[in-house]
Design a protein with these regions (language model features):
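Short, surface-exposed "cap/lid" segments of acyl-processing enzymes
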Residues: 64-67, 71-105
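Alpha/beta-hydrolase active-site loop
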Residues: 98, 131-151
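Primarily recognizes the serine-hydrolase "nucleophile elbow" in alpha/beta-hydrolase
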Residues: 147-203
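Accessory cap/linker subdomain of secreted extracellular hydrolases
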Residues: 184-255
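Short beta-strand/loop motif that positions the catalytic acidic residue
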Residues: 260, 266-268
């Protein structure tokens, strides 16, 4: 039972189902966890999306002489802040600082970036109706941020970088007209979210509990009471998150990437226990023009890892552990080659 509870917590990190619970007690965790290098400068950057103002951070090289490429970094699921860390109670499960570190390294490579706090964090949480929030709202936020950056004369071209759920958001945003020269999908699923979630559960639940999950999740998505399900899975089926999950579940990333009109870079860690290499290869199969980079040692937050689930836990919580050295050069080189 104890091991199941630990697994249940890890499952929350791959879906946005948890954002309504954790965000209720969250404050914006947009502060830098570690000091950025002197080679970069950071400035506040905010943009409007509908009635909301989404706060973020602009990171640039401390010295530059011409217009820079710029990336909009889009966070993964749950109450994940601009730096890649979970807010509220889930902070103990995810404090990798991935997006801040990526931004600093991109700046050192001559690429500016903006990372932002999603709409379910901080003051904006009080301005939205969680029960009416859909994945399309998050896609609209990406488009709004992209349009502001594309109009900024400091920048030469815009790339969208999304991690985990954010990979699907940037793909959808580009397909809906976000003015991007290309998109980067980090640890992005290649199947509908419910298929990904079921696969994870199948590795961790006894068969009888998996059967209950299948029935309960189907009822949940139909708008009915989920009914009998293991207590550790109930946070995944909260009524307040139903609309979000209904709208997310209808999208298939493989179908969406096949429609992509801009270049795509897919980056995947071979030791990612949340999104497998098969997902990355499914994305490339659906869009053969996409470039795929598999980093052999990397996990979901791009730290060197084994396949041991418990050993990986520390890699999510210690921001001082270095990001794998292959990550940023793969992204930066690809961006610089884009026309």
């Amino acid at each position: 039972m104890n091991s199941f509870r630990r697994i249940g917590v890890s499952l929350l990190s791959i879906t946005s189902l948890a954002f309504s619970v954790a965000a209720q007690t969250a404050t914006v965790a947009g502060r830098i966890d570690t000091v950025p290098p002197r080679s970069v400068i950071e400035l506040p950057f905010a943009f409007q999306s509908g009635t909301l103002t989404l706060p973020g951070t602009l990171t640039m090289p401390a010295s530059y002489s011409s217009r820079l490429p710029v990336a909009l970094i889009v966070a993964g699921s749950g109450p994940t802040d601009r730096n890649g860390n979970s807010a509220g109670p889930l902070r103990a499960q995810n404090n990798s600082n991935l997006y801040a570190i990526l931004a600093w390294q991109l700046a050192d490579a001559g690429i500016a970036s903006v990372r932002y706090d999603k709409r379910a964090l901080g003051e904006n949480l009080q301005k939205i109706n969680l029960a009416q929030t859909s994945i399309d709202d998050f896609i609209a936020d990406v488009i709004a941020g992209a349009r502001k950056l594309a109009a900024d004369q400091r920048f030469s071209k815009l790339v969208l970088i999304g991690h985990s759920e954010g990979a699907e958001l940037v793909l959808q945003a580009a397909n809906r007209g976000a003015p991007a020269a290309g998109i980067v999908m980090l640890s992005g699923a290649g199947r509908p979210i419910m298929a990904v979630l079921r696969e994870q559960l199948s590795k961790q639940l006894p068969p009888e509990e998996l059967v209950k999950w299948d029935s309960a999740s189907a009822r949940y998505l139909r708008g009915e009471d989920a009914g009998d399900v293991h207590p550790g899975l109930k946070p995944l089926l909260l009524p307040v998150n139903r609309r979000f999950m209904q709208t997310w579940a209808k999208y298939d990333p493989a179908t969406e990437i096949a429609r992509a009109k801009v270049p795509v870079l897919i980056v995947q860690g071979a030791h990612d226990l949340q999104i497998g290499e098969a997902d990355a290869r499914a994305l490339q199969a659906a869009q053969p023009a996409a470039k795929l980079v598999v980093i052999p040692a990397a996990n979901h937050v791009f730290r060197a890892a084994s396949d041991d689930r418990m050993a990986q836990a520390r890699l999510y919580t210690d921001p001082t552990i270095p990001v794998v050295p292959e990550l940023t050069p793969a992204i930066a080189d690809w961006i610089k080659r884009l026309k």
